[in-house]
Protein backbone atom coordinates (compact mmCIF):
# COMPACT_ATOMS: atom_id res chain seq x y z
CA UNK A 1 0.00 0.00 0.00
CA UNK A 2 1.21 3.50 -0.81
CA UNK A 3 1.46 5.95 2.05
CA UNK A 4 1.19 8.88 -0.36
CA UNK A 5 -2.21 10.50 0.25
CA UNK A 6 -4.58 11.44 -2.55
CA UNK A 7 -7.79 13.50 -2.51
CA UNK A 8 -9.75 10.23 -2.54
CA UNK A 9 -8.56 9.61 1.02
CA UNK A 10 -10.65 12.64 2.10
CA UNK A 11 -7.99 14.15 4.34
CA UNK A 12 -8.84 17.71 5.37
CA UNK A 13 -7.19 20.37 7.53
CA UNK A 14 -8.41 23.45 9.32
CA UNK A 15 -6.81 26.70 8.20
CA UNK A 16 -6.11 27.31 11.90
CA UNK A 17 -3.92 24.18 12.11
CA UNK A 18 -1.10 24.85 9.67
CA UNK A 19 -1.78 28.55 10.19
CA UNK A 20 -1.10 28.42 13.94
CA UNK A 21 1.75 30.81 14.64
CA UNK A 22 2.92 29.13 17.84
CA UNK A 23 1.54 31.69 20.25
CA UNK A 24 0.58 30.21 23.62
CA UNK A 25 -0.16 31.54 27.13
CA UNK A 26 3.57 31.62 27.92
CA UNK A 27 5.14 32.79 24.67
CA UNK A 28 4.73 34.90 21.58
CA UNK A 29 4.41 33.63 18.02
CA UNK A 30 7.36 31.72 16.58
CA UNK A 31 6.11 31.78 12.98
CA UNK A 32 4.64 34.41 10.72
CA UNK A 33 1.10 34.46 9.39
CA UNK A 34 0.09 32.24 6.47
CA UNK A 35 -2.23 33.47 3.76
CA UNK A 36 -5.22 31.08 3.57
CA UNK A 37 -4.77 30.71 -0.19
CA UNK A 38 -1.15 29.66 0.34
CA UNK A 39 -2.26 27.07 2.89
CA UNK A 40 -4.72 25.70 0.34
CA UNK A 41 -2.01 25.36 -2.29
CA UNK A 42 0.54 23.75 -0.01
CA UNK A 43 -1.95 21.25 1.43
CA UNK A 44 -3.09 20.35 -2.08
CA UNK A 45 0.52 19.59 -3.00
CA UNK A 46 0.68 17.21 -0.05
CA UNK A 47 -2.38 15.29 -1.28
CA UNK A 48 -5.13 16.72 0.91
CA UNK A 49 -8.77 16.72 -0.15
CA UNK A 50 -9.86 20.00 1.39
CA UNK A 51 -9.66 22.70 4.01
CA UNK A 52 -12.01 24.01 6.68
CA UNK A 53 -12.20 27.37 8.40
CA UNK A 54 -13.55 29.57 11.15
CA UNK A 55 -14.91 32.84 9.81
CA UNK A 56 -12.04 34.74 11.46
CA UNK A 57 -9.41 32.42 9.92
CA UNK A 58 -10.45 33.59 6.49
CA UNK A 59 -11.64 37.12 7.14
CA UNK A 60 -10.04 39.19 9.93
CA UNK A 61 -12.48 40.20 12.66
CA UNK A 62 -13.87 43.65 11.93
CA UNK A 63 -13.02 43.65 8.21
CA UNK A 64 -15.04 45.98 6.00
CA UNK A 65 -17.35 44.55 3.36
CA UNK A 66 -14.83 45.32 0.61
CA UNK A 67 -11.99 43.74 2.59
CA UNK A 68 -14.17 40.72 3.27
CA UNK A 69 -14.93 40.33 -0.43
CA UNK A 70 -11.23 40.52 -1.30
CA UNK A 71 -10.28 37.83 1.23
CA UNK A 72 -13.01 35.52 -0.07
CA UNK A 73 -11.96 36.16 -3.68
CA UNK A 74 -8.33 35.23 -2.98
CA UNK A 75 -9.40 32.10 -1.10
CA UNK A 76 -11.70 31.05 -3.94
CA UNK A 77 -8.86 31.43 -6.40
CA UNK A 78 -6.79 29.01 -4.35
CA UNK A 79 -9.66 26.52 -4.30
CA UNK A 80 -10.27 26.85 -8.03
CA UNK A 81 -6.58 26.44 -8.89
CA UNK A 82 -6.18 23.28 -6.81
CA UNK A 83 -9.59 21.62 -6.84
CA UNK A 84 -9.58 21.61 -3.04
CA UNK A 85 -12.95 21.36 -1.29
CA UNK A 86 -14.45 23.04 1.78
CA UNK A 87 -16.40 20.21 3.47
CA UNK A 88 -16.91 22.03 6.77
CA UNK A 89 -16.89 25.49 8.33
CA UNK A 90 -17.41 26.90 11.79
CA UNK A 91 -17.65 30.17 13.72
CA UNK A 92 -15.06 31.71 16.02
CA UNK A 93 -17.01 32.57 19.18
CA UNK A 94 -14.00 32.45 21.48
CA UNK A 95 -11.11 34.73 20.46
CA UNK A 96 -12.48 38.28 20.67
CA UNK A 97 -12.88 39.56 24.25
CA UNK A 98 -16.60 40.06 23.65
CA UNK A 99 -16.91 36.27 24.02
CA UNK A 100 -15.11 36.13 27.39
CA UNK A 101 -18.26 34.65 28.96
CA UNK A 102 -19.32 32.66 25.92
CA UNK A 103 -21.40 33.22 22.84
CA UNK A 104 -24.67 31.27 22.92
CA UNK A 105 -24.71 31.13 26.74
CA UNK A 106 -23.19 34.47 27.71
CA UNK A 107 -25.03 36.09 30.60
CA UNK A 108 -25.06 39.28 28.50
CA UNK A 109 -28.09 39.00 26.19
CA UNK A 110 -26.61 41.40 23.62
CA UNK A 111 -23.59 39.13 23.22
CA UNK A 112 -25.83 36.10 22.67
CA UNK A 113 -27.76 37.87 19.93
CA UNK A 114 -24.52 38.95 18.27
CA UNK A 115 -23.16 35.39 18.44
CA UNK A 116 -26.21 33.97 16.67
CA UNK A 117 -26.03 36.62 13.93
CA UNK A 118 -22.27 36.11 13.48
CA UNK A 119 -22.88 32.39 13.07
CA UNK A 120 -25.69 32.90 10.57
CA UNK A 121 -23.51 35.17 8.46
CA UNK A 122 -20.80 32.54 8.24
CA UNK A 123 -23.30 29.76 7.50
CA UNK A 124 -24.24 31.68 4.36
CA UNK A 125 -20.58 31.83 3.31
CA UNK A 126 -20.03 28.17 4.21
CA UNK A 127 -22.91 27.10 1.98
CA UNK A 128 -21.64 29.36 -0.79
CA UNK A 129 -18.27 27.59 -0.62
CA UNK A 130 -19.84 24.12 -0.64
CA UNK A 131 -19.61 23.13 3.02
CA UNK A 132 -21.65 20.04 3.87
CA UNK A 133 -21.38 20.29 7.67
CA UNK A 134 -21.31 23.18 10.11
CA UNK A 135 -19.38 22.59 13.33
CA UNK A 136 -20.09 24.34 16.63
CA UNK A 137 -17.46 24.31 19.37
CA UNK A 138 -18.50 26.17 22.50
CA UNK A 139 -15.06 26.79 23.91
CA UNK A 140 -16.19 29.76 26.02
CA UNK A 141 -19.56 28.29 27.01
CA UNK A 142 -18.96 27.47 30.66
CA UNK A 143 -17.70 28.86 33.94
CA UNK A 144 -14.91 28.93 36.50
CA UNK A 145 -17.10 29.46 39.57
CA UNK A 146 -20.31 27.90 40.79
CA UNK A 147 -22.56 30.94 41.12
CA UNK A 148 -21.49 32.56 37.84
CA UNK A 149 -23.64 30.37 35.61
CA UNK A 150 -27.03 28.77 36.15
CA UNK A 151 -26.27 25.72 34.04
CA UNK A 152 -29.91 24.71 33.54
CA UNK A 153 -30.76 28.17 32.21
CA UNK A 154 -27.56 28.26 30.16
CA UNK A 155 -28.61 25.00 28.51
CA UNK A 156 -31.97 26.64 27.73
CA UNK A 157 -30.06 29.40 25.94
CA UNK A 158 -27.86 26.86 24.17
CA UNK A 159 -30.95 25.02 22.97
CA UNK A 160 -32.53 28.30 21.87
CA UNK A 161 -29.47 29.20 19.80
CA UNK A 162 -29.30 25.85 18.05
CA UNK A 163 -33.05 25.86 17.43
CA UNK A 164 -32.70 29.32 15.83
CA UNK A 165 -29.88 28.09 13.61
CA UNK A 166 -31.89 25.02 12.65
CA UNK A 167 -34.83 27.25 11.78
CA UNK A 168 -32.56 29.44 9.67
CA UNK A 169 -30.97 26.69 7.57
CA UNK A 170 -34.39 25.09 7.07
CA UNK A 171 -35.95 28.39 5.95
CA UNK A 172 -33.09 28.94 3.50
CA UNK A 173 -33.31 25.43 2.08
CA UNK A 174 -29.73 24.65 3.11
CA UNK A 175 -28.71 21.01 3.40
CA UNK A 176 -26.14 21.80 6.08
CA UNK A 177 -26.39 19.76 9.28
CA UNK A 178 -24.64 20.86 12.47
CA UNK A 179 -21.97 18.94 14.37
CA UNK A 180 -21.49 19.84 18.03
CA UNK A 181 -17.91 19.51 19.26
CA UNK A 182 -17.57 18.52 22.93
CA UNK A 183 -14.66 19.44 25.20
CA UNK A 184 -14.42 19.14 29.00
CA UNK A 185 -12.35 22.25 29.78
CA UNK A 186 -9.92 24.82 28.33
CA UNK A 187 -10.20 27.66 27.78
CA UNK A 188 -13.02 27.76 30.39
CA UNK A 189 -12.54 25.99 33.70
CA UNK A 190 -15.52 23.77 32.85
CA UNK A 191 -17.24 23.74 29.46
CA UNK A 192 -20.88 22.87 28.81
CA UNK A 193 -21.48 19.67 26.79
CA UNK A 194 -18.08 18.29 27.86
CA UNK A 195 -18.22 14.84 26.22
CA UNK A 196 -19.81 12.94 23.35
CA UNK A 197 -22.45 11.53 25.70
CA UNK A 198 -23.44 14.97 26.97
CA UNK A 199 -23.79 16.26 23.41
CA UNK A 200 -25.87 13.28 22.27
CA UNK A 201 -28.26 13.73 25.19
CA UNK A 202 -28.54 17.47 24.49
CA UNK A 203 -29.35 16.87 20.81
CA UNK A 204 -32.37 14.76 21.74
CA UNK A 205 -34.00 17.86 23.25
CA UNK A 206 -33.66 20.10 20.19
CA UNK A 207 -36.61 20.98 17.97
CA UNK A 208 -35.01 19.43 14.87
CA UNK A 209 -32.71 16.73 16.29
CA UNK A 210 -32.20 15.23 12.85
CA UNK A 211 -30.15 18.31 11.88
CA UNK A 212 -27.60 17.80 14.66
CA UNK A 213 -24.80 15.36 15.29
CA UNK A 214 -21.38 15.44 16.90
CA UNK A 215 -17.84 16.35 15.89
CA UNK A 216 -15.70 14.52 18.46
CA UNK A 217 -11.99 15.29 18.78
CA UNK A 218 -9.43 12.72 19.89
CA UNK A 219 -7.72 14.95 22.44
CA UNK A 220 -10.91 16.37 23.90
CA UNK A 221 -12.33 13.01 24.97
CA UNK A 222 -8.93 11.82 26.19
CA UNK A 223 -8.59 14.98 28.32
CA UNK A 224 -11.61 13.61 30.19
CA UNK A 225 -9.96 10.20 30.57
CA UNK A 226 -12.36 8.54 28.12
CA UNK A 227 -11.84 5.87 25.48
CA UNK A 228 -12.12 7.74 22.18
CA UNK A 229 -12.85 4.74 19.91
CA UNK A 230 -15.65 3.72 22.29
CA UNK A 231 -17.14 7.21 22.08
CA UNK A 232 -16.96 7.16 18.29
CA UNK A 233 -18.62 3.74 18.27
CA UNK A 234 -21.52 5.14 20.29
CA UNK A 235 -21.82 8.15 17.97
CA UNK A 236 -21.91 5.79 14.98
CA UNK A 237 -24.46 3.58 16.76
CA UNK A 238 -26.65 6.65 17.27
CA UNK A 239 -26.23 7.73 13.64
CA UNK A 240 -24.73 11.01 14.86
CA UNK A 241 -21.10 11.00 13.72
CA UNK A 242 -21.40 13.97 11.37
CA UNK A 243 -17.70 14.93 11.42
CA UNK A 244 -14.52 13.99 13.30
CA UNK A 245 -11.34 15.78 14.42
CA UNK A 246 -8.16 13.71 14.43
CA UNK A 247 -5.07 14.56 16.46
CA UNK A 248 -2.86 13.16 19.23
CA UNK A 249 -2.97 13.49 23.01
CA UNK A 250 -0.80 12.04 25.79
CA UNK A 251 -3.12 11.49 28.73
CA UNK A 252 -5.16 13.80 30.92
CA UNK A 253 -3.58 17.22 30.62
CA UNK A 254 -3.98 20.38 28.56
CA UNK A 255 -5.15 20.08 24.95
CA UNK A 256 -1.90 19.13 23.20
CA UNK A 257 -3.17 18.99 19.60
CA UNK A 258 -0.33 16.71 18.53
CA UNK A 259 -0.33 15.47 14.96
CA UNK A 260 -2.38 12.31 14.47
CA UNK A 261 -0.58 9.15 15.63
CA UNK A 262 1.67 10.35 18.47
CA UNK A 263 0.18 10.20 21.95
CA UNK A 264 -1.98 7.10 22.35
CA UNK A 265 -0.94 5.03 19.34
CA UNK A 266 -3.05 2.00 20.29
CA UNK A 267 -6.17 4.18 20.50
CA UNK A 268 -5.31 5.65 17.10
CA UNK A 269 -5.08 2.11 15.68
CA UNK A 270 -8.47 1.11 17.07
CA UNK A 271 -9.99 4.38 15.87
CA UNK A 272 -8.82 3.86 12.29
CA UNK A 273 -9.93 0.23 12.45
CA UNK A 274 -13.39 1.38 13.55
CA UNK A 275 -13.79 4.18 11.00
CA UNK A 276 -12.71 1.97 8.12
CA UNK A 277 -14.65 -1.15 9.13
CA UNK A 278 -17.80 0.87 9.91
CA UNK A 279 -17.76 2.47 6.47
CA UNK A 280 -17.53 6.05 7.74
CA UNK A 281 -17.73 8.21 4.61
CA UNK A 282 -16.97 11.67 6.00
CA UNK A 283 -13.71 13.60 5.86
CA UNK A 284 -10.75 12.52 7.96
CA UNK A 285 -10.21 15.97 9.41
CA UNK A 286 -6.99 16.89 11.21
CA UNK A 287 -7.25 19.44 14.01
CA UNK A 288 -3.71 19.72 15.33
CA UNK A 289 -1.04 22.33 15.98
CA UNK A 290 2.45 22.02 14.49
CA UNK A 291 4.72 22.56 17.53
CA UNK A 292 6.02 26.07 18.03
CA UNK A 293 9.55 24.68 17.74
CA UNK A 294 9.01 24.22 13.99
CA UNK A 295 9.61 26.54 11.05
CA UNK A 296 7.35 26.33 8.00
CA UNK A 297 9.16 23.24 6.70
CA UNK A 298 8.22 21.60 9.98
CA UNK A 299 4.61 22.73 9.58
CA UNK A 300 4.25 20.91 6.27
CA UNK A 301 6.16 17.88 7.57
CA UNK A 302 3.72 17.72 10.49
CA UNK A 303 0.70 17.92 8.18
CA UNK A 304 2.13 15.23 5.92
CA UNK A 305 2.78 13.08 8.99
CA UNK A 306 -0.89 13.19 9.98
CA UNK A 307 -1.93 11.69 6.66
CA UNK A 308 0.93 9.19 6.48
CA UNK A 309 0.21 7.89 9.97
CA UNK A 310 -3.48 7.41 9.15
CA UNK A 311 -2.63 5.45 6.00
CA UNK A 312 -0.13 3.25 7.85
CA UNK A 313 -2.69 2.49 10.55
CA UNK A 314 -5.34 1.83 7.89
CA UNK A 315 -3.05 -0.74 6.29
CA UNK A 316 -2.24 -2.38 9.63
CA UNK A 317 -5.91 -2.52 10.64
CA UNK A 318 -6.89 -4.14 7.32
CA UNK A 319 -4.14 -6.74 7.73
CA UNK A 320 -5.34 -7.45 11.27
CA UNK A 321 -8.91 -8.07 10.12
CA UNK A 322 -7.79 -10.25 7.19
CA UNK A 323 -5.47 -12.46 9.26
CA UNK A 324 -6.96 -16.01 9.55
CA UNK A 325 -5.43 -16.43 13.01
CA UNK A 326 -7.11 -13.22 14.11
CA UNK A 327 -10.44 -14.41 12.74
CA UNK A 328 -10.08 -17.64 14.72
CA UNK A 329 -9.11 -15.65 17.82
CA UNK A 330 -12.20 -13.46 17.41
CA UNK A 331 -14.36 -16.58 17.46
CA UNK A 332 -12.49 -17.91 20.49
CA UNK A 333 -13.26 -14.62 22.24
CA UNK A 334 -16.95 -15.18 21.40
CA UNK A 335 -17.39 -12.03 19.32
CA UNK A 336 -19.79 -14.01 17.13
CA UNK A 337 -21.94 -14.70 20.21
CA UNK A 338 -22.03 -10.99 21.09
CA UNK A 339 -23.65 -10.41 17.70
CA UNK A 340 -26.49 -12.80 18.58
CA UNK A 341 -29.59 -11.32 20.31
CA UNK A 342 -29.72 -12.23 24.00
CA UNK A 343 -33.37 -13.22 23.71
CA UNK A 344 -34.09 -13.59 20.03
CA UNK A 345 -37.43 -15.26 20.71
CA UNK A 346 -38.49 -12.51 23.10
CA UNK A 347 -39.30 -12.31 26.78
CA UNK A 348 -42.06 -14.91 26.68
CA UNK A 349 -39.61 -17.54 25.41
CA UNK A 350 -36.86 -16.44 27.80
CA UNK A 351 -38.87 -16.70 31.03
CA UNK A 352 -39.75 -20.44 30.87
CA UNK A 353 -36.32 -21.46 29.49
CA UNK A 354 -34.71 -23.28 32.43
CA UNK A 355 -31.29 -23.26 30.72
CA UNK A 356 -31.25 -19.48 31.04
CA UNK A 357 -31.46 -19.47 34.84
CA UNK A 358 -32.60 -22.50 36.85
CA UNK A 359 -30.25 -24.96 35.12
CA UNK A 360 -27.50 -22.44 34.29
CA UNK A 361 -24.18 -23.24 35.99
CA UNK A 362 -22.54 -19.88 36.83
CA UNK A 363 -19.40 -21.56 38.20
CA UNK A 364 -18.83 -23.45 34.97
CA UNK A 365 -19.39 -20.28 32.96
CA UNK A 366 -17.04 -18.35 35.23
CA UNK A 367 -14.33 -20.94 34.60
CA UNK A 368 -14.41 -20.37 30.85
CA UNK A 369 -11.50 -18.18 29.72
CA UNK A 370 -12.29 -15.41 27.25
CA UNK A 371 -8.97 -15.50 25.32
CA UNK A 372 -8.86 -11.71 25.12
CA UNK A 373 -5.11 -11.49 25.78
CA UNK A 374 -4.22 -13.64 22.79
CA UNK A 375 -6.49 -11.55 20.59
CA UNK A 376 -5.04 -8.31 21.89
CA UNK A 377 -1.47 -9.50 21.35
CA UNK A 378 -2.29 -10.34 17.74
CA UNK A 379 -3.54 -6.77 17.37
CA UNK A 380 -0.33 -5.42 18.91
CA UNK A 381 1.74 -7.60 16.59
CA UNK A 382 -0.02 -6.08 13.60
CA UNK A 383 0.20 -2.56 14.99
CA UNK A 384 3.94 -2.92 15.65
CA UNK A 385 4.64 -4.52 12.27
CA UNK A 386 5.57 -7.94 13.66
CA UNK A 387 3.12 -9.79 11.37
CA UNK A 388 2.89 -9.59 7.61
UniProtKB/Swiss-Prot annotation:
It comes from Streptomyces diastaticus. Its EC number is 5.3.1.5. Transmembrane segments: none annotated. The keyword Cytoplasm applies. The active site is at 54, 57. This is Xylose isomerase. It catalyses: alpha-D-xylose = alpha-D-xylulofuranose. Homotetramer. Its cofactor is Co(2+).
Amino acid sequence: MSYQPTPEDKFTFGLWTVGWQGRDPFGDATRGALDPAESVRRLAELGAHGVTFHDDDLIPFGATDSERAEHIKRFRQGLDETGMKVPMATTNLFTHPVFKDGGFTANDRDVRRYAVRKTIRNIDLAVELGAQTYVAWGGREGAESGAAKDVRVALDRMKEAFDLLGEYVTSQGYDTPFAIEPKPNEPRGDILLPTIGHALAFIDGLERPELYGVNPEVGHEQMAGLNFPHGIAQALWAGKLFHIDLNGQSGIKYDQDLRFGPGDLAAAFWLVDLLESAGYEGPRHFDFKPPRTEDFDGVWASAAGCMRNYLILKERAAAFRADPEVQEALRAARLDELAQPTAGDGLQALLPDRSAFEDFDPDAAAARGMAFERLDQLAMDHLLGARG
